[in-house]
Amino acid sequence: MTNTTAAIVFHNYPQSPVAEKVRVAFGIKTLSWQDVEIPRLPPKPMLTALTGGYRRTPVMQIGADIYCDSQCIIHELERRYPTPSYMPTSDAGLMWCLSRYTDGEMFTLTVKLILGSAGDTLPEDFAQDRGRLYLGEDWADGLKRANEQLPHLVSQLRAPLSWINAQLSDGRAFLLGSAPAAIDAQIYYAVWFIRGRWSGGPSMLSEFPDLMRWEENVRALGHGTSKPMSADAAIALAKSSIPTSAIGVAENEPQGLETGMLVSISPDLDGGEQPVSGNVRYADANTISIERSSDEVGQICVHFPRAGYRVTVA
């Protein structure tokens, strides 16, 4: 049985938009969490010791269970803390489908707009790291194209922002009604990023009064209650714990995975990232969990979403 009272440890940094998504998710459920601040740029040795090489932000840790990707994190928070629900209506499946757009195309447009508008003012190391992560191997050309296509990128973002504004035009407090939902956090983080990191953001967002009203409602949810924690303490917590998550492989597994099988996992795009290897502990349509061990962190279990990640049998 999962221990829902175990401490939530959140590895993040303040400027991360994807971490902001999860911080808002903490606020929706008024959760308490331990805040481990990680570097904005690699190397991130204390983080990758826990994840087996995954370097993206954020990562959630509960004992020796390590959750990578905000999709996986929000699923697990809902499972452990079902009230209040991230899915207050009967549209949970539809909202998860919509989140694939907000986390995919919509966020990619936002990144291109922000990186492209910054142009040569970006620090070289930051431009190279984020460019490679989001724009592929030819990231320098990608940044140049983004800069040249700024009006087009703005037009592509204004469309979904106008849809969101229309959804809120009946005066509802949140996207699905009177109660906040995961999809509020999954859209808000892009708006937060646009407002905070693009000089034209406040002006563009001002075109959408209902969206701005909603933005204030989401901001007022807060981030739950956090206390700082050192990376060393997080490592020690993992080493003194054992994984408590489920074991097994669901029926109709399309890749023929079995418990104990050695696999590697990586984002299903070319971001130049190191795959994470381990032995299958659990797999179903939504999640894959692998076991790893090292002298530094002991026995751990690293969890990833199935959607958006490639699993390769070793």
Predicted regions and their residues:
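Short, hydrophobic secondary-structure boundary micro-motifs
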Residues: 86-89, 175-177, 227
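N-terminal short leaders/motifs
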Residues: 6, 10-18, 219-229, 236
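Mixed-charge, Lys/Arg-rich low-complexity intrinsically disordered regions
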Residues: 224-259
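GST-like domain detector, emphasizing the conserved glutathione-binding G-site
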Residues: 1-134, 141, 257, 264, ...
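Short, charged beta-turn/beta-strand-edge "cap" motif at the junction between a beta-strand
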Residues: 268-272
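Short gly/pro-enriched beta-turn/loop segments at secondary-structure junctions
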Residues: 180-182, 257-260
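GST-like fold's C-terminal all-alpha helical module
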Residues: 102-220
